[in-house]
């Protein structure tokens, strides 16, 4: 092509320079000026890697002055193009010579990029199409937010999260027993609400001691990066905003932190949260006469926030008044009068009795049948009542149907979820081993001296000190004291570990100093590999210690944890727990055992307690075991009995030598424990348990998600994505891959990839046992960000390939076109449930025939060969007129497919949302816990969804030209 001064060209290799202008031409060389970047380039005339920029009728171009022109015609004058058409600003006719085109011109449409020579690699085109397909398939999955968590697939947890997470502004009480995973349930609900766009701002309020546990759980299990607000962080944020809480979307803080300052609390309330989560909500004290300041603070926040999750102890442990107080936070209009609530609860007693009858499988007597009829009076249930007393195959089905009807009418089943260990099977047996050891003379002396020196300390402080004689000795003797040389617990631990080399052993002690000293002794005395876990370590350092312990190959045999350091970490792969000392209260004891005693623990848990005779430890072992049965079973009564006997317990811990009355004290505690436990068992609400654990549906949900684990398509796509993006991958032998950034990535910082890299696995079980490995799923930020990176930009939007096929004539031209059918709408409407961005692939020939149905993408892609960009540009220029014609023919074909997709989406949305609305309206007639605002929100959502689907459209997303060759 002849070159003329003023012509506009674009660089094939440096498209970021913008639009270039020919400023010098001689016999062998040309010079281009790129005004947008201020750069000059000198090219050889014979083979310059540049492409002439030529627009066509229908295109919109921008002048260097900023106004835009809709092109109607193009003519050439002395080698320069003149665009004729209508200005978009004042609708007047105008001409624009190419020399006056905006130099910052970018090409967004795939066909424009193709004709401008901005041609991408063919592997990127394939990646873009696969990304579109996978994005579409994942959007249609019904378990979004549940699949990507790094946690075992526990049916009752999945059921609660699925049930609550799908609601508009859920306000519920999660009251599972300890060890059943309330934190995970809350995390799954948060994750779903965020992914679905129902929430974007989340506030978690927890006790100060649990802040880091929540921070770790949300990050490690759900890849949610919360900001922990304390005084220091608040002061920093105050520099950036008048309301510091508006500087972050996801926030964790303690109630004490915000209560200390009235202005701070007001800012928190006014920060427009979408979802409020309150842990340990049973500590919020309430009475009708004088609610506590903490309760009132949470009440104020709950009223200002649409969605609320309260995590609390079980209702039976709380007592009815305390339970009512929690429900009142969720729905003050519904739960406004305590006496009315008590009367209503009595009315639900027959419902629970009826369910017990149906579950038992026995035939119903006349009185029982009448009771069922009364409870479900407005329904035609006569056939079902007959079926439950028959021997037909319909018996069980009828019972399940009646139970489902009763559940819909249950008083608080929509706002309260409560599972018990008895209702959820799969927990291991706990076996206690008490190891009685002699009290060394050094400790005897230290304890006596300490008693004299610390007489002015409070009784409680002295009692706590008595539990840790090694610390008493260390304080008296100084830093050079070597208590581990004579403490018989150390010798016992060494012998136990050397005798059980093949077992992973978790050792927990109260103090970080004790943990560090024990690790040193194990390493120097017996070369035992041990990791240490304490509050002085960063989260990353704790991850590494946990991973070292979890590793089967060359991993640590022992993990030594301090009390605080072990919070929020679970080690189900180990089954041996050594308590080097004992905690001060039963909640901490259960927390220690809970590190191993989780659903998914495959072995019996061996609890080993080496204790020194005639010490506070010895007395506490007896009280925990004989008084509370707290070692071998969970102890829901522990806190109640501890509070009731707190003063007496402290006194006995400080006067261990005086054994008088100890047996009676322990016997009294045991009687109280047995009585309370019996009351709790009698108060079990089996209907609520059924509703909370999800039954067979929950099992099917867990199975369905498990079947999607280790998805081969995910592994293939992810590795292909990492390759093309330019992320380094290093395979490890144990199903792990190390990812690190490279110098040639598509973007300087890949979202979700740390600067120092990360370790990933596609195996859920592997991720659970390796704290340092990230579990890759379709919901992981690396994959979601990767999809966004590819699809939100131009990556792979146009390509040119060669097809070596002697069955076709040389020069045969095919255009592979990928259109996207999509609807634009606010995220919270979740339009993607019905019409996610949907790729429609066409494979056009010159005759206007679509061959896509006969030629599958992957097999076709494998037959193609890449072409360099310069050659590609020449090919495109040669067939530009043909491509325009093919695009026009394709437009008519894609319209029919797109309109069909849109119509189907409208019908599905109307049917699904109408059914949902009708179901809630029917339930509201029999269950007052259906809130009016839920119905209003659903009706509004239905109208908006249908309106936005009506506006759905389609566009060309990617184009690949394929030219047949025989060479």
UniProtKB/Swiss-Prot annotation:
SMART domains for this protein: DEXDc, HELICc
Motif, DEAH box: chain positions: 279-282
GO biological process: regulation of DNA-templated transcription
Residues given in the record as ATP binding sites: 176-183
Known EC number: 3.6.4.-
Record's subunit section: Interacts with the RNAP. Has a higher affinity for the core RNAP than for the holoenzyme. Its ATPase activity is stimulated by binding to RNAP.
Function: Transcription regulator that activates transcription by stimulating RNA polymerase (RNAP) recycling in case of stress conditions such as supercoiled DNA or high salt concentrations. Probably acts by releasing the RNAP, when it is trapped or immobilized on tightly supercoiled DNA. Does not activate transcription on linear DNA. Probably not involved in DNA repair.
Official protein name in the record: RNA polymerase-associated protein RapA
């Amino acid at each position: 092509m002849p070159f003329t001064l003023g012509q506009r060209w674009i660089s094939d290799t440096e498209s970021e320079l913008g639009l270039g202008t020919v400023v010098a031409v001689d016999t062998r060389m040309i010079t281009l000026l790129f005004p947008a970047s201020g750069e000059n380039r000198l090219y050889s005339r014979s083979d310059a890697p540049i492409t002439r920029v030529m627009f066509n009728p229908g295109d919109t171009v921008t002048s260097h002055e900023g106004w835009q022109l809709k092109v109607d015609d193009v003519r050439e004058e002395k080698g320069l193009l003149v665009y004729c058409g209508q200005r978009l600003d004042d609708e007047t006719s105008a001409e624009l010579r190419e020399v006056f085109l905006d130099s910052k011109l970018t090409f967004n449409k795939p066909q424009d990029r193709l004709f401008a020579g901005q041609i991408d690699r063919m592997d990127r085109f394939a990646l873009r199409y696969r990304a579109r397909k996978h994005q579409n398939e994942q959007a249609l999955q019904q378990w979004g937010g549940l699949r990507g968590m790094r946690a075992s697939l526990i049916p009752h947890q999945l059921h609660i999260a699925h049930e609550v997470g799908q609601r508009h502004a859920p306000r519920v009480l999660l009251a599972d027993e300890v060890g059943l995973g309330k934190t995970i349930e809350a995390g799954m609900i948060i994750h779903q609400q965020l992914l679905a766009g129902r929430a974007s701002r989340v506030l978690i309020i927890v006790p100060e001691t649990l802040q880091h546990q929540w921070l770790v759980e949300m990050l490690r299990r759900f890849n949610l990066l919360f900001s922990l607000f304390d005084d220091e962080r608040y002061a920093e944020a105050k520099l950036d905003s008048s309301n510091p809480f508006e500087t972050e979307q996801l926030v964790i803080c303690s109630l004490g932190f915000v209560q200390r300052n009235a202005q701070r609390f007001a800012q928190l309330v006014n920060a427009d949260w979408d979802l409020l989560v309150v842990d340990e909500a049973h500590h919020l004290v309430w009475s009708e006469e004088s609610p506590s300041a903490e309760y009132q603070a949470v009440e104020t926040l709950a009223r200002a926030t649409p969605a609320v999750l309260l995590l609390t102890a079980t209702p039976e442990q709380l007592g009815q008044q305390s339970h009512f107080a929690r429900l009142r936070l969720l729905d003050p209009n519904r739960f406004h009068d305590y006496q009315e609530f008590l009367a209503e609860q009595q009315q639900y007693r027959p419902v629970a009795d009826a369910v017990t009858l149906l579950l038992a499988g026995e035939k119903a007597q006349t009185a029982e049948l009448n009771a069922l009829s009364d409870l479900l009076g407005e329904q035609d249930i006569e056939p079902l009542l007959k079926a439950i007393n028959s021997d037909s195959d319909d018996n069980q089905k009828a019972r399940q149907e009646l139970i489902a009807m009763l559940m819909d009418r249950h008083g608080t089943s929509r706002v309260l979820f409560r599972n018990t260990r008895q209702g959820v099977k799969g927990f291991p047996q706990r076996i206690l081993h008490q190891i009685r050891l002699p009290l060394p003379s050094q400790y005897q002396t230290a304890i006596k001296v300490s008693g004299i020196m610390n007489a002015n300390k409070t009784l409680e402080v002295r009692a706590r000190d008595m539990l840790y004689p090694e610390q008493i000795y260390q304080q008296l003797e100084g830093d050079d004291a070597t208590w581990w040389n004579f403490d018989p617990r150390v010798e016992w631990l060494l012998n136990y570990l050397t005798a059980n080399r093949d077992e992973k052993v978790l050792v927990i002690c109260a103090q970080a100093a004790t943990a560090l000293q024990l690790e040193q002794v194990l390493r120097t005395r017996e070369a035992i590999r041990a990791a240490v876990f304490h509050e002085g370590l960063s989260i990353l350092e704790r991850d590494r210690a946990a991973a070292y312990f979890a590793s089967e190959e060359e991993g640590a045999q022992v993990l030594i944890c301090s009390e605080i350091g072990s919070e929020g970490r679970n080690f189900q792969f180990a089954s041996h727990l050594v308590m080097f000392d004992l905690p001060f209260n039963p909640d901490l004891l259960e927390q220690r055992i809970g590190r191993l005693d989780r659903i998914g623990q495959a072995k019996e848990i061996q609890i080993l307690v080496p204790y020194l005779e005639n010490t506070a430890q010895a007395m506490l072992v007896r009280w925990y075991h004989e008084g509370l049965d707290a070692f071998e079973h969970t102890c829901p009564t522990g806190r109640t009995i501890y509070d009731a006997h707190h003063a007496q317990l402290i006194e006995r811990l400080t006067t261990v030598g005086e054994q008088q009355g100890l047996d009676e004290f322990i016997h009294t505690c045991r009687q109280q424990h047995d009585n309370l436990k019996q009351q709790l068992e009698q108060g079990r609400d089996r209907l609520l348990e059924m509703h909370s654990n999800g039954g067979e549906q929950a099992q099917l949900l867990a199975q369905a998600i498990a079947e999607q684990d280790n998805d081969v398509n995910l592994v293939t796509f992810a590795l292909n994505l990492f390759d093309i993006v330019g992320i380094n991958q290093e395979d490890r032998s144990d199903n792990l891959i190390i990812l690190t950034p490279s110098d040639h990535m598509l973007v300087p910082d890949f979202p979700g990839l740390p600067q120092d890299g990360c370790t990933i696995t596609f195996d859920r079980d592997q991720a659970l046992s390796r704290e340092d490995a990230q579990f890759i799923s379709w919901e992981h930020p690396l994959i979601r960000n990767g999809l966004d990176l590819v699809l939100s930009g131009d990556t792979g939007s146009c390509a040119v390939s060669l097809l070596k096929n002697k069955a076709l004539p040389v020069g045969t031209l095919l255009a592979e076109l990928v259109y996207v059918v999509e609807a634009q709408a606010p995220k919270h409407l979740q339009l993607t449930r019905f019409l996610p961005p949907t790729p429609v692939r066409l494979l056009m020939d010159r005759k206007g025939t679509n061959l896509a149905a006969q030629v599958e993408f992957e097999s076709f892609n494998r037959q193609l060969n890449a072409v360099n960009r310069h050659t590609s540009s020449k090919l495109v220029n040669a067939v530009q007129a043909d491509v325009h014609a093919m695009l026009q023919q394709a437009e008519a074909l894609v319209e029919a497919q797109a309109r069909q997709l849109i119509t189907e989406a409208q019908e599905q949305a109307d049917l699904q949302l109408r059914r949902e609305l009708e179901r809630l309206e029917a339930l509201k007639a029999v269950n007052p816990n259906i809130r009016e605002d839920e119905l209003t929100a659903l009706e509004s959502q239905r109208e908006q969804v249908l309106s936005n689907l009506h506006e759905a459209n389609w566009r060309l997303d990617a184009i690949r030209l394929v030219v047949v060759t025989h060479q």
